[in-house]
Every structure is written in C-alpha cells, then in structure tokens.
Amino acid sequence: MPDVVGAGKTRWAWAVATFFGAGLLRPGPGTYGSVAAVLLWFGAAHWFHAAGVGLAVGTGAAALAATLIGIPAATVVAREVGREDPGFVVIDEVAGQWIALIAVRPDWKHAALALLLFRAFDIWKPWPIRRLERLPEGTGIVLDDVAAGALALALGLAVSRWV
C-alpha cells in the first residue's frame, strides 16, 4: 500500500487522486471510488432537494471539476510512484461515475443502474475507450473513464425507460 502522507509526497494530489482515501480500500479500489461518488451524489441530491435540470447541471459541474483537477493529481501521483496507472488512483472513476449520473433520477434503482453500467464499461473498456488509455499520464488515466461514463450515460438513458 502506498505511503500517502509520507515524506516527499504531494498531499493535495494524493488526497484528490485517491478521492480522500477511497482508492486505498481493498479489494477493488475502482469500485470503492465509484460507490463513493454515487453515495456523495445521492446524498447531495437529497440534501439539496435537487432533481431535473438543477441536478444535471450540478452533476455535470462536479464531473468537470473532478476531471480538470483529477488529471494533474493523477499525473503527480503516477510520477511519484513510478507507475502508469496506479490502481489506487480513483479520481478517474469519480469523474466517470458522475458523468454516468448526469441525467439520472435521484433514486436507488437509477443510481444502481448507472453504477453497474459505468463499472462494466470501465472494466471492459470497449473501443474507443481503450485507445484513450494511451494518452500521456493523467490525461490517459482520467479520460478513458470519462468516456466510459459517457457510454454508461447513453445506455442508461435508453434503458431507464423500462426501470
């Protein structure tokens, strides 16, 4: 397990990249990152009584922020550990999961569907998602999950008519 707060580590990047420690949980840190994103989204939706366009805009803004902050954070952490795509970096799952949730009704059935679809696309990585992994450093780490989130959103919207 990585030493998150050890000497020579960039703390802000580790906090963001691991989504405040969710990526340090085992097994399946990516799933923990996605579940944390869904729980935060679900809690915020109900706390702020958000739905419809307001929830979609807020979720999209959160996904954009996670992407824009996540790329440099993932780059820093990957460099510090000397690995291309460390498994404990889960800000990419958070960004992708929030994209998958952009147009989802804030109920458990639709949230679970978005979670399952996103994790399936994130693990499977169909074309062109796999090609995005080849982008350099944090860009490749994050953008493949952003694309997986977009595919999960599209399929989720199609399927949600029957859920």
What positions do the PLM features span?
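Active-site-proximal helix-loop elements at catalytic-domain edges
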Residues: M1-P2, G58, A112-A114
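Helix-coil boundary and interhelical linker segments in multi-pass alpha-helical membrane proteins
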Residues: F42-T59, A100-H110, L157-V163
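Interhelical loop and helix-boundary elements at the membrane-water interface
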Residues: M1-V35, V53, I69-L101, A120-A150
